[in-house]
Amino acid sequence: MIPYFVTDGIKVVTTGEQNAIYFQPTVWAHLTVGLGAPSYIFLEVFMKKVGIIMGSDSDLPIVKKATDMLKILDIPFEVHVYSAHRTPVEARDFAVNARDNGFGAILAFAGMAAHLAGAIAANTTLPVIGVPCKGGCVDGLDALLSTVQMPTGIPVATVAINGGANAALLAAQILAVSDADLAKKLDEKRVNDAKVVLEKDAGIMDRL
């Protein structure tokens, strides 16, 4: 195995051979180390992943709104079904190890007694974005309140009920703080979204 370590999104490979495992996107740089004959290490910068956790596979249609948006932005992601109530050990283990496993933000989807986002946030200091899912007797209001009303010290960013796309965009904006290429993609998306609205404006009178 090629020796390497990862720190803050950078894989440092201590070898002169470019045959390490690749992550996408990759940027390689050669650095001279020492004063004698040149030796090299390779720095491989890779985009952090977005973790997506749903409490039940019934939330999948809302999750797909998020994954579709992440695909548009070329952001890698990983999806799991972990319940805060039925599989608390697995949910906790995912959260505890998320940073070391290359995640930069976590989306948590749950309905009704929606404790998933809070349970994840309690076990990581990565940004956690809660997505309350519509369902139950009050059409998702219970999930919204369960997700947003977090105690001081354990924050959860919460989007609208069924707001999977906005959750993905918020995660992208968080990652873009340290990723200029992703920030550019987000800027371009804003411009394209505005063009779509203006095209509709230009043709609205013809529809009356």
Predicted regions and their residues:
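Short, Lys/Arg-enriched N-terminal segments with co-localized hydrophobic residues
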Residues: T32-F46
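Glycine-rich phosphate/diphosphate-binding loop of Rossmann-like nucleotide-binding domains
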Residues: V50-R86
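C-terminal binding/interaction regions
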Residues: S58, L141-R207
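Active-site-proximal loop->helix
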Residues: T67, R92-A95, A122, D139-P151
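N-terminal beta-loop-helix "entrance" segment that forms/cooperates
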Residues: Y82-R99
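Glycine-rich phosphate-binding loop
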Residues: F94-P132
